[in-house]
């Protein structure tokens, strides 16, 4: 009968939705485990096996400084997420630079994110703030006693150093002159009102040979062993000559961020998706009762 058909359809809908809810319950339980794995969980989900080796090599279990997924570690999902906008901010400065016009955006590669993360962890956990040099890549690092935003980070790495670069270039000086000639160094200090004039971070950002980058960020309420609450880093490489990356898995920041957000949002929304579907199941059960 029509009535029986309606009952059967309602029963089928309930059965199907019950399966969905059971799966979502499992997803929710696994989400907490995956969140705790930080960037490792993300790299595993997308099959970035070379990248996982970097985390493994530098993990605390192997005597390194990377405590995978910990809140005050660059591999935590929140710190990873925070670091992504640094790529875009740096690219905007790079591609509009007046000294080297026509530069293209740096692409990204998961392995360079991992290298940036483990190197920044080594920096933050060192006795003093400095480059860890664990891998052969270019690197900019910065530290602050507050939660630094991209503008402030790149103000130090780019804006202030471009002033120095422009000043010495206008006088026909090189960066070696700046380093080795005390009188010239002092002149730049006074002219630009900069305590430590330098150009190395700026020249990394505008280096035409670099093709690919990865970034990392740490903020912890208590200062890290290097004395700073905030540590940030960006590494640079060229996949033609790199020991770590190839064109495979090298992509735009937009493509990478889409992957990251899909993974992150699924984990973070596991709770609400479960409760939405539980509500849907309850209303389907109520419909079934009405049909009987």
Model-derived segments and their meaning:
Residues 1-38, 253-292:
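Long, non-membrane, amphipathic alpha-helices that form coiled-coils
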């Amino acid at each position: 009968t029509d009535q029986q058909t309606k009952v059967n359809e309602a029963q089928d809908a309930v059965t199907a939705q019950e399966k969905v809810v059971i799966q979502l319950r499992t997803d929710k339980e696994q989400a907490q485990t995956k969140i705790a794995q930080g960037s490792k969980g993300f790299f595993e989900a997308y099959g970035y096996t070379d990248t996982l080796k970097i985390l493994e090599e530098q993990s605390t279990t192997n005597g390194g400084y990377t405590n995978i997924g910990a809140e005050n570690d660059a591999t935590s999902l929140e710190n990873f997420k925070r670091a992504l906008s640094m790529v875009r901010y740096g690219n905007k400065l790079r591609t509009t630079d007046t000294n080297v016009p026509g530069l293209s955006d740096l692409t990204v590669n998961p392995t360079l994110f991992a290298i940036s993360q483990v190197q920044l962890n080594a920096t933050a956990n060192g006795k003093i703030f400095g480059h860890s040099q664990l891998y052969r890549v270019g690197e900019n690092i910065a530290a602050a006693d507050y939660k630094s935003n991209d503008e402030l980070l790149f103000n130090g790495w780019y804006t202030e150093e471009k002033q120095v670069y422009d000043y010495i270039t206008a006088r026909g000086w090189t960066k070696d002159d700046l380093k080795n000639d005390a009188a010239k160094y002092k002149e730049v200090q006074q002219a630009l009102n900069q305590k430590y004039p330098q150009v190395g971070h700026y020249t990394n950002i505008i280096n035409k040979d670099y093709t690919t980058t990865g970034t990392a960020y740490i903020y912890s309420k208590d200062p890290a062993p290097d004395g700073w609450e905030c540590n940030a880093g960006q590494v640079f490489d060229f996949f033609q000559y790199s020991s770590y990356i190839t064109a495979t898995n090298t992509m735009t920041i937009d493509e990478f961020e889409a992957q990251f957000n899909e993974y992150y949002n699924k984990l973070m929304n596991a709770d609400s998706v479960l409760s939405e579907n539980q509500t849907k199941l309850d209303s389907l059960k109520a419909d079934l009762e009405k049909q009987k």
